[in-house]
Amino acid sequence: MRIGIVAGELSGDQLGGTLVEALKQKYPNAIIEGIGGPKMAAAGFKSLYPMDALSLIGFLEIISKGLRILSIRRKIINYFKQNKPDIFIGIDAPDFNLTVEKELRSAGIKTIHYVSPKIWVWREYRIKKIRKATDKILAILPFETEYYKNRHKFEAIYVGHPLAKNIPIHIDRAKYRDKLGLKGSSLPILSVLPGSRTTEVSRLLPLFLLALQKLVDAGYKFKAIMPLAKPSLKPLFAKYKEQIDSLGIEVFETNSHDVLKASDLSLLASGTATLEAMLCKLPMVVGYKLSWLSALIGRMLIGNHSYWAFPNILHKNEIIKELIQEDCTVDNLFSELKRLFDDKRRNDYIVEEFEKIHKEMVIDTESKIIQVLDTMIEKS
């Protein structure tokens, strides 16, 4: 059996890593190849091109690096047309993967898109391309199946999110503090996750650090910890080493899971990390900034969509504070961080609601995906 997979960024590599592990258990001799990151490679995946080349955000970055992406996309399409897989799975990265899927499907290859494009937020017109590109959408959010069915008469299958299964409902935080060498700390532990992409981190890290300094100056006592999302961010972190050190922030070259599981509270960028923090039952403050052009175009396409962060989308209310674009200022971050430390009753409520959502999301994701995959291959 031959299976093609393309993941475009770290969150896709996390999903792909657990999926490749499960596929290798079910089909030990399968050739599984395409584009992926370190977690997928560790599970036995062959990456034909570096995943980092696809990890872009914002319209300016796409314009500046777009030619390389287009070249890689054309090469991966040609490769799979010449080395036809039994099935192709595009993990997220819809702007890249839907075109790949469309071309491969037109060549007679079965295609799956894993992680629904957020057409319920913006660019709903993409449903036309989705219909042409993919045989099945695998949704990781519970409400998406009904959205596709009722609004677009298209089948999306809810497969859950692997994190909901892999992260326990009740976390032994002491275990992860011991693992990180934080044993015995009596201070509340605040995880700081300014993003996984260079552009995100360059915009958010300085703001986060200044807000934390104001928190310290106001007399708040805490221990801040931060994961290094990937080695390529080391030079950027080094640029702010003096501030990081003066705040006593410990930077760990480990995955975000361990850092979040060791934490009491979190300050982080909007994105998949907010889902992970929610499953770790962390009251949080979310910040995000795009370039002015990306923000302008994004707002034209999104309109007045209410929420950006996964906890708010899933809860259907602003259960945690989002500070987006011009609202993402040092003063606003500081104000919300103070609230995070001061309002225990609110934090207890947030934890209770996150636990309810977590329980609803638990499903054996990989087994469900393999079941879908088997059915599609049998019918072909």
UniProtKB/Swiss-Prot annotation:
HAMAP family: LpxB. SUPFAM superfamilies: UDP-Glycosyltransferase/glycogen phosphorylase. Its EC number is 2.4.1.182. Pathway: Bacterial outer membrane biogenesis; LPS lipid A biosynthesis. NCBIfam families: lpxB. Coiled coil: none annotated. Pfam families: LpxB. Signal peptide: none annotated. InterPro entries: Glyco_trans_19 (IPR003835). It comes from Francisella tularensis subsp. holarctica (strain LVS). It is an enzyme of class 2 (transferase). This is Lipid-A-disaccharide synthase. PANTHER family: LIPID-A-DISACCHARIDE SYNTHASE, LIPID-A-DISACCHARIDE SYNTHASE, MITOCHONDRIAL-RELATED.
